[in-house]
Every structure is written in C-alpha cells, then in structure tokens.
Amino acid sequence: MVRYFNEDIKYVLKQKLLNNRWLKTVAGSEMKKLGNINIIFCSDNYILEVNLKYLQHDYFTDIITFDYCEKDILNGDLFISIDSIKDNAEHYGTEFENELCRVMVHGLLHLIGYDDH
C-alpha cells in the first residue's frame, strides 16, 4: 500500500491511482511486491533537517529513503522535497510531474537494492 503525507507543506498528488499502479509495476519488474510505502512530501528545509538528524549529511537533496524491507516485500519511507523537484524540473527542462515520478522511482529503486553508483 502506498500512502502519501505532507510534512511542512501542502501538496496534492495528481492521479494517485495511476502513480500507485506504476510503482507496483516497477516493483514487479524486479520481482518485488509493494508493502507499506510512505511518501512524505516536504520542503527543502525539512529534508535538510532529516538529512542532518538521521544521516549526518549537511546538504539539501531531492529524496531520502529509509528502508524497512522484508525479503521481497518493499517497505519504507520516502521523503521528497517538492522544492527540489521544482528546481530539478526547471533545470532539466522537464515537467514537474515527470520529475516527481522519476524521483519516486529513484526512491523505490533504493528499496529494491540499487544505490546511486
């Protein structure tokens, strides 16, 4: 089950059902199943606080993923900075929604076991 939350901002995801199906398809393509996925939309300042508190990283980022997976069941928290998504979309010349989807899948791929390198 994918659930969406807002931390210090208000953001409403368009087409939640379509997004959920897409995430399920990505997980299935890697022989994984969605368990409990919490996607938390927040600001740059909030994600910086999370980065400092839990990872001891003093920099902004677009996503932080906390992995609680059990074997082939994906469970985790994905903190996503809406501010960074807006900046990334502008920088890369893409639509906000496309960049948001890219970052959500990026987080899901971390839960599957991929890293940034």
Language-model region placement:
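An acidic/histidine-cluster motif and surrounding catalytic segment
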Residues: 1-101, 109-117
